[in-house]
């Protein structure tokens, strides 16, 4: 193997000996790649195939950014997912003095009639995405929207707005332009580093036919090295008899049942080295493809199938955890790459620090109670992160200035709903709109499962349910 590597390396060096714009990358098969695209050998960025039947998957091959590709949408389509997996791509760009992950997102998506379904540089969409502490921003009128932060492996799934839910997905030949932020840095001003028109992506398009689905297969990976109250290590074989785990599963299932989805749950173990590496205080401050969380998600390759992968760890470490605010769950991307197991974005991570907490023996016996029953709290976190993976955004973000693109989820805008003490801070990053401020007709959404803060209330709206049931993960 050492001799073979030397021969391959020599061949790669011969391919680009004089170009200052490329480097040989051992971690990517000794390919000649743009600077910044080569990552350490310990960073796995696998390209995988969809687990869905061939009739749902259009594999379009590997293409350079800037390439416009056609794809076909059948007459009975309910949703479309455009999936880009980096073959060669840098990790970050610097835009207006901010370091951003090099996210993959279609530059444009074109309807069969030639109209534009999505334009990543649409000024009207950019204006609507700006902070709106008065609640005046309305993303629901756009056919589809993009939430950002989808480096390396990205799914762009629609419908995800009221407009696209109402109008559906027209039959015919669509087009989209392969793209990432590095490519856009060559097209717009404001980028000081990371721009490149040489990124290459493996591209697939998933079409999910009507009717909407009603079943979701969920894989819980026990990464945390914890013991149950009897002193036994929590592992997949004893999860089915663990009272707290089963309470968590029942509550999780009830949250999906309200929108007509049956959650079928399985538990899997990981090996001791994975538990030691990822299981305790997993750092999620950064979530690029080479970070620990994203590398953990590649463990889902062990089980082939169309799963919602949820990784259970003892706790999360994040710079966003300050004072009484703790990060307890995080998704790879919104939405996730449904049916693509084993990528750096194939799942969500959940803290089970409170799994065995209860204020009394009766706390976990009745209705869902995330305050007094730790298993219910874990269920809420898991369902919330699954909602993100299926395409749902927060109903209201923590500053009370950004809202989801659905008309039947109430807003809680800062200028109307924050406390008198917080109101002068509206329009900055300082206010945090608590759920208690968002429980009225004019200031709502605090009891929705997708509110930004873990708080009592697991409601899901009709349109949220539609987005979830149209995702290719739900069958």
Go through each PLM region and give its residues.
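Noncatalytic accessory or regulatory domains flanking protease catalytic cores in secreted, cell-surface
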Residues: 63-71, 108-195
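Hydrophobic helical h-region of N-terminal Sec-dependent signal peptides
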Residues: 5-13
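Active-site-proximal segments of metallohydrolase catalytic domains
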Residues: 262-372
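Bacterial Sec-dependent N-terminal signal peptides
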Residues: 15-52
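The catalytic-center signature of Zn2+-dependent metalloproteases
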Residues: 278, 363-466
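Non-catalytic, beta-strand-enriched accessory regions in extracellular/secretory proteins
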Residues: 48-83, 88-97
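Fold-level signature of zinc-dependent metallopeptidase catalytic domains
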Residues: 184-187, 191-284, 313-317, 326
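Short, surface-exposed beta-strand/strand-loop-strand elements in extracellular ectodomains
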Residues: 92-118
